[in-house]
């Protein structure tokens, strides 16, 4: 992160797709940015559950995965790879991170899925498994922000494990204390308005 100050890094924030974003991969997407620096950005889409059960691909982690217990499509890149994102209760204030968990922002962190699940079982509050991720090259995300493709908002630990991922886009917008709250009422198909 040599060229970026902590203030300008968007790591840990949410990218919320604007209604104008035309890419079907990101229609009404809520992306948690796991890394953002001068080399590019990486995140996972929090609101794209798949019909695949976690137990079908990562049996040992199934008991730790929160409801609905399915794999989420994290984005269009590397769909054959899995990422684990978990919230540690009290994680923002906990000094020592549990072995196998690396803090991204506050109580949210990445889980080493190669580690034995029992190593983290007592420490994890909620876990989501993502197939693939969303990635941007150097400056690409910044260009999309200038073009108005994304709203940038603060994340909350509960966003990772929302029990209603299909409502997350509206819920995140609705909690904003500015004009973004009104965007939550935007119709799914504006031509029917």
Curated annotation (Swiss-Prot):
InterPro entries: AlgH-like. It comes from the Bacteria. Signal peptide: none annotated. GO terms for cellular component: cytosol. HAMAP family: UPF0301. NCBIfam families: PRK00228.2-2. Belongs to the UPF0301 (AlgH) family. This is UPF0301 protein SAV_5129.
